[in-house]
Each structure stands twice: as structure tokens, then as C-alpha cells.
């Protein structure tokens, strides 16, 4: 785990709008990309109105092809999860640049700084 992820954990712990969060165990989500490789996001976060899949990356890694392929697969996973979520909440994916995570900021602020991901055809 990176220091960026540690700082995000602190933000999540301190934000009253965050109901719960987890760092998912390896290979538990069934999230695949590129020739059956498994992707494990850094965090799953629930707020009162939404659920989020969060990936934290260093600024110099956000444009990496592998990171972008994982992001596209995660966006599709979130679209499917939104349709069957038992709580009726929408799932959203966020790619967060590690240097944008500052202890003391809110979770909403952190995800507002997320890197846009373009899915083919959109």
C-alpha cells in the first residue's frame, strides 16, 4: 500500500458522509480486463447516495495504458453493479491522483479532483 492510499484512508475515516469503505481482498470482485487479467481496485466506498470504486495512482501513471484499460473495465463493472445494487445506489468509478489527496479534505473534494476517463465511443 502506498502513502497516497494511507492518506485516502484517513480522509475516509474522518469524513462523516462516508458510511463505510473497504480495501477489497484480491480477486474477489470478478473484475476482468485485457485477456482475462484481474483488476483489484484500491477502495470501495459507500456514501448516503452513491457507492464508489476508487483507484489511486501517482500523477505519472494515470495515462498509463494498463491503468486506462483497468479504468474502462471498472466503469463497465460499475454500470452493471448500479443496475443490481440491493440498496438502489449508483456505482461510480474514480481515478484519483495521489498527490491530490490531502488529509483534512473531504471525500467529496477528493473525488472531485479525479482524472476523467474516456470510454471508447463516448
Task: Write out the residue ranges for each language-model feature.
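Electrostatic, structured charged patches in enzyme active sites and in nucleic-acid/phosphate-binding
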Residues: 1-122
Amino acid at each position: 500500500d502506498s502513502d497516497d492510499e494511507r492518506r485516502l484512508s484517513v480522509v475516509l475515516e474522518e469524513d462523516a458522509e462516508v458510511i463505510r469503505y473497504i480495501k477489497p481482498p484480491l480477486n474477489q470482485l470478478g473484475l476482468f480486463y485485457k485477456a482475462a487479467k484481474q483488476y483489484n481496485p484500491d477502495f470501495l466506498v459507500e456514501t448516503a447516495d452513491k457507492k464508489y470504486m476508487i483507484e489511486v495512482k501517482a500523477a505519472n501513471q494515470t495515462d498509463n495504458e494498463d491503468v486506462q484499460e483497468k479504468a474502462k473495465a471498472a466503469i463497465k463493472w460499475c454500470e452493471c453493479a448500479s443496475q443490481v445494487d440491493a440498496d438502489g445506489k449508483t456505482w461510480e468509478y474514480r481515478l484519483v491522483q495521489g498527490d491530490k489527496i490531502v488529509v483534512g479534505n473531504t471525500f467529496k473534494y477528493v473525488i472531485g479532483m479525479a482524472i476523467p476517463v474516456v470510454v471508447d465511443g463516448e
